[in-house]
UniProtKB/Swiss-Prot annotation:
The modification Pyrrolidone carboxylic acid (Glu) is found at residue 53. The lineage of its organism: Eukaryota, Metazoa, Ecdysozoa, Arthropoda, Chelicerata. This is Huwentoxin-IV. The record marks 58, 78-79, 82, 84 as: Binds to the extracellular loop of voltage sensor domain II of sodium channels (Nav1.2/SCN2A and Nav1.7/SCN9A). Residues 25-52 form a propeptide. Changing residue 85 to W: 12-fold increase in ability to inhibit hNav1.7/SCN9A, and no change in activity on hNav1.5/SCN5A. In m3-huwentoxin-IV; 43-fold increase in ability to inhibit hNav1.7/SCN9A. Coiled coil: none annotated. Shows a weak or no inhibition on rNav1.4/SCN4A (IC(50)=3.9->10 uM) and hNav1.5/SCN5A sodium channels (IC(50)=>10-25 uM). This toxin has also been shown to weakly inhibit Kv11.1/KCNH2/ERG1, Kv1.2/KCNA2 and Kv1.3/KCNA3. Residues 1-24 form the signal peptide. Changing residue 84 to A: Almost complete loss in ability to inhibit both Nav1.2/SCN2A and Nav1.7/SCN9A. Transmembrane segments: none annotated. It holds the Pfam family Toxin_12.
């Protein structure tokens, strides 16, 4: 009977220890994911402040001063005054 009480106590202590280890591991993962998300958002916020050298698709433009991104094959449409994709050239 003493062995059974001791084994039950050890089993219960093992379960408590397993719970504590899992809880600590989970909280570390949450902290890591929160830090990762914060760093990604910080990088995104920094890039918003910088101006691009050229305009992206569907951005308003001036046909006489075409600043649409040439690397993306964009041109300023005289009709709509937006940067659009140039097909065929």
């Amino acid at each position: 009977m003493v062995n059974m009480k001791a084994s039950m106590f050890l089993a219960l202590a093992g379960l408590v220890l397993l719970f504590v280890v899992c809880y600590a591991s989970e909280s570390e993962e949450k902290e890591f994911s929160n830090e990762l998300l914060s760093s990604v958002l910080a990088v995104d916020d920094n890039s918003k402040g910088e101006e691009r050298e050229c305009l992206e698709i569907f951005k308003a433009c001036n046909p006489s001063n075409d600043q649409c991104c040439k690397s993306s094959k964009l041109v300023c449409s005289r009709k709509t005054r937006w940067c659009k994709y140039q097909i065929g050239k």
